[in-house]
C-alpha cells in the first residue's frame, strides 16, 4: 500500500532505456498488468487495498482470509485478473477504432453522469444501512471538492496556511490507505482486548483450497465484469475504482443469492478482480489509437513509447512493427493454455 503501478512503470522507463524495444515494451506492459492485480494481495490478507481499484476486493476477499481461505482467495483473484486482462486485450485487438471513436464523443456531461451513476451504486450496496451509505458518499464528494478549481484557479475550502500544499486537494490513494488502515487497526485492537488469540493450525482440510469449481456458473460474471472494466478504461479519467464498484454492483444485482456478497464468496471477488484487469486493455485503446492516456499509468507509457522511438500520436497506425513487442508476449501466455489469437 502506498506504492502505485505508475511509480513502478516510471522507474522501468529509465531502466529499459537501452533495451531492445520488444523487450522493453514487454517488461513495462508486464509490470503494468501484474501491478494492477497486486493491490489485491493486501486487500485480501489485511483488509487494506493496495490500489484504489481494490476497494471492492476487500468486501469478500478479507472475510475469506479470516476463515483461513486466504490462499484460495488469492488464487481466485489471480485467475480472475488473468481472464479479465485476456478479454480486454481481445477487445483491444478487435475494437480499438470503434471504442476510441465512442470515447471521443464522451464529453464532461457524460462523464459526470457515469460518476453520478457510480455514486448511486452506494445505495444499492448499502441495503440495511442506507443512512450510513449516503453519509459516506456525501462525505466523499465533499472531500473531493477541496483544492484548486481549474476553471478560475480559485481555492475551495482550503485554509490560507495550507494553500501551498493543498492545490490538488487530497490524493485518492493516501486517503484510502489511511481510512482502511486506521479502521483495521482499531478493529484489531478491539478484538485483541476482548478475546484471547488462540494458536491457529496451518493445515488445510481440503475444503478451503482453490479449484476450478469456484468458477462454476461464473462465466457470465467473468465476461460482464471484464467488459465493464474495458469500457471504463477507454474513458480517460474515470478510474478503476468506479469500474470495480459498478462491476460488483452488477454481480450483486444478477446474483441468485445477493445477500451472500460481502460475506466472503467467490462471486464478489471474481467481479472485482476481473473488472480491475479488464481496465488495462481498455486504457490502452485510446493510447494506441489516439495518443490519449486512459489513466496515470498509460500516461507514463507514452514516455516509454517515445524513448523507444514510437510516436505518441496514432501509434498503432504508424508504428505497428514496434508495437508488435506487446503482442507476442500475450500470445505465449495463450499458447500455454492451448490456444492463440491471430493478429496482423
Residue ranges and their predicted role:
Residues 12, 16, 26, 30-42, ...:
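Alpha-helical transmembrane segments in multi-pass membrane proteins
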Residues 74-193, 307-324, 328-335, 344:
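Membrane-embedded alpha-helical modules
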Residues 1-9, 23, 44-57, 106-111, ...:
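Short, non-helical or kinked segments that cap or interrupt transmembrane helices
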Residues 1-5, 35-47, 122-127, 226-238, ...:
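Transmembrane alpha-helix interface/packing and boundary motifs in multi-pass membrane proteins
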Residues 11, 45-73, 98, 201-203, ...:
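Flexible loop linkers connecting adjacent transmembrane helices
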Residues 32-43, 51, 265-290, 312-324, ...:
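A structural-propensity feature for long, helix-poor, extended segments
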Residues 22-26, 64-80, 256-268:
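Membrane-interface alpha-helices at helix entry/exit sites of multi-pass transporters
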Residues 1-24, 97-100, 104, 159-265:
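Helix-loop-helix hairpins and the membrane-proximal interhelical loops
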